[in-house]
């Protein structure tokens, strides 16, 4: 998964993460059932706060793009044509 963060961007960092993951899901780059990096691993890779990545994942889950399995991780949800 490739995510680029820009401090020059007007959007908050969590929103940049949200948008890029959502676009990868919609394009099929992240297929349904695909495991996403853990919140901590993604935060470390992007050099951002765990709270920032947690918020992005929560927003993606609220929007129906992800689902979380406790103690297992976050996964891409099945495509819902009503979301697109």
What does each of the following model-derived ranges do?
Residues 1-35, 41:
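Extreme N-terminal segment that seeds HTH/winged-HTH DNA-binding domains in transcriptional regulators
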Residues 2, 27, 33, 47-48, ...:
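Generic secondary-structure boundary/loop-capping signal
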Residues 9-16, 49-59, 72-73:
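Short, mixed-charge, low-aromatic patches
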Residues 19, 52-53, 68, 81:
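Residue-identity detector for threonine
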Residues 36-67:
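N-terminal helix-turn-helix
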Residues 63-84:
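HTH-adjacent hinge/linker in prokaryotic transcriptional regulators
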């Amino acid at each position: 998964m490739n995510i680029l963060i820009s401090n020059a961007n007007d959007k908050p960092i969590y929103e940049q993460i949200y948008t890029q993951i959502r676009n990868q899901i919609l394009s099929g780059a992240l297929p349904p059932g695909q495991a996403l990096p853990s919140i901590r691993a993604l935060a470390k890779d992007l050099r951002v706060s765990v709270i920032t990545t947690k918020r992005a994942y929560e927003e993606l889950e609220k929007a129906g793009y992800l689902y979380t399995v406790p103690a297992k991780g976050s996964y891409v949800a099945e495509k819902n044509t009503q979301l697109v």
